[in-house]
Amino acid sequence: MAVQQNKKSPSKRGMHRSHNALTVPGIAVESTTGETHLRHHISPTGFYRGRKVLKTKSEA
């Protein structure tokens, strides 16, 4: 098992953790329906960037 040779200082520990921050997922608002959805994903009603791209079960 690996064992550290020297104690990591609080400064180095903080630098090591600098990339561990959580990010907020990008939320977009559909222009035609006003619904929110994840960026680069279609909305629950089947719209993407103002166009109908998928038929929903209620329409089929």
Curated annotation (Swiss-Prot):
GO MF, one example: structural constituent of ribosome
**What's the superkingdom here?**
Bacteria
Where is composition skewed (Basic residues) in this entry?
9-19, 49-60
Q: Residue span of the signal peptide, if any?
A: none
Record has Membrane as a keyword:
no
Q: Identify the SUPFAM superfamilies for this entry.
A: Zn-binding ribosomal proteins (SSF57829)
- Keywords for this protein: Ribonucleoprotein, Ribosomal protein
The terms describing its cellular component in GO are: large ribosomal subunit
Q: Which InterPro entries match?
A: Ribosomal_bL32 (IPR002677), Ribosomal_bL32_bact (IPR044957), Ribosomal_zn-bd (IPR011332)
One Gene Ontology BP term is: translation
Keyword Ribonucleoprotein assigned: yes
Give the span(s) annotated as Disordered: 1-60
The record's section on HAMAP family has:
Ribosomal_bL32 (MF_00340)
Family of the protein in this entry = Belongs to the bacterial ribosomal protein bL32 family.
Quote the protein name from its UniProt record. Answer: Large ribosomal subunit protein bL32
